């Protein structure tokens, strides 16, 4: 039930291992840190990592008359989370489903979860372009989806897959809100200097060629990795980091696109 959700943002990646779920999670936390009410929906059925990233493993969801009730991270109920990970008894249990069953589960997540007055719903999708993505796009035709953010790394093999993702978005009619280049450079935990140990600026160049906004370049920062397993936002814990600055910029970009006022500045 998305009738109480003002804005829907889909987070995509051309391939796995680019940090899409981490970006989705920190974006949701950054939006909450700036005063928004946020929902985070993890539809990566075969590799749900959002419960782990937020330290919510072992949480139980239940159903009410209006549908599934998401997990709230605290009593303020400003961040609601739903993932198939909450339905698995063991984190190591594989989800061995054929396409139709996956499609049915995703439709349930998009239509039967009781989201309450959310400014934003962030949807963390599986990597690639598959049945799951087509299902999401079909369901998004029934609700106001603002568009998609694509996460990539600067390596050529990842960028090749992102080109396919861009084509997929165009063919399915979803607006591209921008590209985030992740894992670009390494931040020394001692001096905080960033060194480009791999290639860099591939995401920025791809955004230029695709004529979509380049939302920022995120480095590998061990300090950000330490926040995994908690609901701590980089905006609060590492306010001077480059990751925090990029997340602020993305929040401001989304607020400008959606005309949602920012209740608080962090």
From Swiss-Prot:
Q: Which InterPro entries match?
A: Mrp-like_CS (IPR000808), Mrp/NBP35_ATP-bd (IPR019591), NUBP2/Cfd1_eukaryotes (IPR028600), P-loop_NTPase (IPR027417), YlxH/NBP35 (IPR033756)
A GO cellular component term found in this entry reads: cytosol
The molecular function GO annotations come to:
4 iron, 4 sulfur cluster binding; ATP binding; ATP-dependent FeS chaperone activity; metal ion binding
Q: Where in the cell is it found?
A: Cytoplasm
From the UniProt record, give one GO term of the biological process aspect. Answer: iron-sulfur cluster assembly
Specify the protein name. Cytosolic Fe-S cluster assembly factor Nubp2 homolog
Entry binding sites for [4Fe-4S] cluster? 188, 191
- Binding-site residues, ATP: 14-21
Presence of the UniProt keyword Metal-binding in the record: yes
Which coenzyme or cofactor does it need?
Answer: [4Fe-4S] cluster
Superkingdom per UniProt: Eukaryota
User: What does the protein in this record do?
Assistant: Component of the cytosolic iron-sulfur (Fe/S) protein assembly (CIA) machinery. Required for maturation of extramitochondrial Fe-S proteins. The Nubp1-Nubp2 heterotetramer forms a Fe-S scaffold complex, mediating the de novo assembly of an Fe-S cluster and its transfer to target apoproteins.
* Assigned protein family: Belongs to the Mrp/NBP35 ATP-binding proteins family. Nubp2/CFD1 subfamily.
- Recite the UniProt keywords alphabetically: 4Fe-4S, ATP-binding, Cytoplasm, Iron, Iron-sulfur, Metal-binding, Nucleotide-binding
The annotation note on the cofactor reads: Binds 4 [4Fe-4S] clusters per heterotetramer. Contains two stable clusters in the N-termini of Nubp1 and two labile, bridging clusters between subunits of the Nubp1-Nubp2 heterotetramer.
Query: PANTHER family per the record?
Result: CYTOSOLIC FE-S CLUSTER ASSEMBLY FACTOR NUBP2, NUCLEOTIDE-BINDING PROTEIN NBP35 YEAST -RELATED
**CDD domains with a match to the protein in the record:** Mrp_NBP35
Subunit description: Heterotetramer of 2 Nubp1 and 2 Nubp2 chains.
Q: Which gene encodes it?
A: Nubp2
